[in-house]
């Protein structure tokens, strides 16, 4: 039985605010060897971890990341009121450099760094790429650049970046010429956008599927050729696979 690798999707998002240092640290403590985060640029082009286009859901604030400087963003906190109330009310927005420092302390961990389309739209491909690579300079060997935006991945390849992953809007987009031209190391797809049946394995690329919190679903996907599973419940999923790993051993 093939057991897929597990990716801490947005950190340990089941129990902590997503894309924050405390959630990523918790995921690593739980045993995560892979983490996934989203990156946007502040007004002064400092890369920070943030998923949404607006601040309201995560911070209960108005506006967008790229409208504020890094210094101004220090006034906001990522606490996800709808899920956690005020439990994490003082939890700051995490910079990409802070994630890099964490990765340096955990060389066994690989991070999938999603370059968000909103920042590429505002600042352009090269500005996003340059600032992200600068922030991650000490730990680039541990990082895979991923995006829905194929041109930014093509630019990374042109600069010699070692590992990229294309996020697909639909599974059949993996056949698109621009996707094939970058020879992605990883192909990401939402579980709901996969074909219901058939082999999902792709030569030359590892398939990563999100969002899965059911161990049996993960095992079925692995049987179809999926290499990695993204999950908000990293600790629970790792624990669920322990008996399977022991039986396999």
Which residues make up each language-model segment?
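Phosphate-group recognition and catalysis centered on beta-loop-alpha active-site segments
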Residues: 1-249
């Amino acid at each position: 039985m093939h057991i897929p690798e597990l990716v801490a999707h947005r950190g340990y998002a089941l129990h902590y605010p997503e894309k924050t240092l405390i959630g990523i640290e918790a995921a690593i403590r739980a045993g995560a060897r892979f983490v996934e985060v989203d990156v946007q640029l502040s007004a002064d082009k400092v890369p920070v971890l943030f998923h949404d286009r607006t601040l309201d859901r995560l911070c209960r604030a108005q506006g967008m990341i790229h409208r504020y400087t890094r210094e101004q963003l220090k006034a906001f906190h990522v606490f996800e009121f709808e899920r956690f109330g005020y439990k994490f009310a003082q939890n700051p927005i995490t910079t990409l450099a802070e994630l890099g420092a964490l990765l340096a302390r955990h060389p066994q961990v690989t991070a999938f760094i999603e370059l968000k389309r909103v920042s590429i739209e505002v600042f352009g491909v090269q500005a996003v790429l340059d600032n992200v690579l600068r922030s991650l300079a000490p730990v680039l060997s541990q990082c895979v650049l991923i995006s829905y935006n194929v041109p930014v991945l093509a630019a990374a390849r042109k600069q010699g970046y070692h590992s990229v992953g294309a996020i697909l809007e639909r599974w059949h987009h993996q056949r698109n010429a621009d996707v094939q031209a970058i020879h992605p190391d990883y192909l990401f797809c939402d579980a709901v956008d996969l074909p219901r049946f058939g082999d999902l394995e792709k030569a030359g690329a590892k398939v990563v599927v999100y969002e899965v919190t059911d161990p049996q679903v993960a095992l079925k996907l692995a049987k179809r050729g999926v290499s990695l599973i993204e999950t908000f419940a990293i600790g629970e999923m790792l624990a669920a696979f322990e008996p399977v790993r022991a039986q396999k051993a």
